[in-house]
């Protein structure tokens, strides 16, 4: 497990420019991630792999690094878009068990802030296109191509659900969501085109 995390950290350190570009924060040194960012990487990757034993250890580390309950929950929810509901739900169940165990030991973890209400006006598809444009810094007015033409429903789901329903939730910044995304894609393997696309966002 430790080798998996170390190799992921080596890849993901390249994505830290996301924090400069997407959240306006100063870019950290490229050889370091802070404790919370490392926890986000590990939690997302281990959830995607289904390594629940390792995940519980990293969930504890994340809480000890002052990641809030809400932020960790949101990381786990976000993973389902890339590794599916079963892995995400098992991660959430593992987190529930960790919180119960910590509570039984008298540990009080910070709840944090829940998501603000998401916008309800306008077309969800257009809202998703707008967010994707913000992330990629490229207009999203090109005609559909490749897999989006072959299976247009997937384009609709990506725009309306992933980039509207999920990315509009403000518990995590865009940069934090990209850390989760790249961690999951790195962990599941055979997703190099998607991984390249998300690195390009950074």
Predicted region positions:
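Acidic, glycine/proline-rich low-complexity segments that act as flexible tails and inter-domain linkers
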Residues: 22-37, 48-65, 70-71, 81, ...
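Non-catalytic tandem-repeat scaffold regions and their flanking low-complexity/translocation tails
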Residues: 75-76
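Short conserved catalytic/interaction loops centered on acidic-Pro-aromatic/His motifs
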Residues: 192-199
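Amphipathic, charged-and-aliphatic alpha-helical interface segments
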Residues: 38-49, 178-191
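Bacterial Sec-dependent N-terminal signal peptides
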Residues: 1-27
């Amino acid at each position: 497990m430790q080798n998996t995390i170390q190799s992921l950290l080596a890849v993901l350190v390249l994505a830290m420019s996301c924090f400069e570009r997407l959240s306006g924060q100063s870019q950290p040194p490229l050889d370091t991630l802070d404790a919370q960012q490392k926890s986000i990487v590990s939690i997302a990757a281990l959830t995607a792999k289904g390594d629940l034993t390792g995940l519980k250890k990293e969930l504890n580390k994340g809480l000890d690094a002052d990641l809030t309950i809400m932020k960790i929950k949101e990381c786990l929810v976000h993973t389902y878009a890339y590794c599916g509901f079963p892995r995400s739900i098992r991660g959430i169940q593992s987190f529930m068990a960790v919180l119960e165990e910590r509570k039984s030991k008298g540990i009080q973890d910070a709840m944090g802030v829940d998501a603000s209400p998401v916008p309800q006006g306008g077309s969800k598809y257009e809202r998703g296109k707008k967010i994707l444009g913000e992330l990629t810094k490229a207009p999203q007015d090109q005609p559909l191509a490749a897999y989006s033409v072959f299976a247009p429903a997937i384009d609709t789901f990506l725009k309306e659900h992933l980039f509207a329903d999920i990315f509009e939730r403000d518990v995590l910044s865009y940069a934090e969501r990209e850390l989760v995304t790249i961690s999951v894609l790195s962990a599941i393997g055979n997703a190099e085109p998607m991984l390249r696309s998300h690195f390009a966002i950074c």
